[in-house]
Amino acid sequence: MKRTYQPSKRRRSSEHGFLKRMGTANGRKIISRRRRHGRKQLTRV
């Protein structure tokens, strides 16, 4: 059986990246919430 996590940089950025977040209203909410909270890393990419 294959393991569930098969890492890929391209897939990671296209699904969780900064540009993807900024592309939707809810994504922008996430970014602003993380900024307010003082996160060093806004997205995981």
Swiss-Prot record:
Tagged with keyword Ribonucleoprotein: yes
GO molecular function: structural constituent of ribosome
Family annotation (HAMAP family): Ribosomal_bL34
Keywords for this protein: Ribonucleoprotein, Ribosomal protein
Residue spans crossing the bilayer: none
Region (Disordered), start-end ranges: 1-45
Pfam families according to UniProt: Ribosomal_L34
NCBIfam families attached to this UniProt entry: rpmH_bact
GO-annotated cellular components: ribonucleoprotein complex; ribosome
Protein name as catalogued: Large ribosomal subunit protein bL34
InterPro entries found in the cross-reference section: Ribosomal_bL34 (IPR000271), Ribosomal_bL34_CS (IPR020939)
Basic residues biased stretches: 1-13, 30-45
PROSITE patterns: RIBOSOMAL_L34
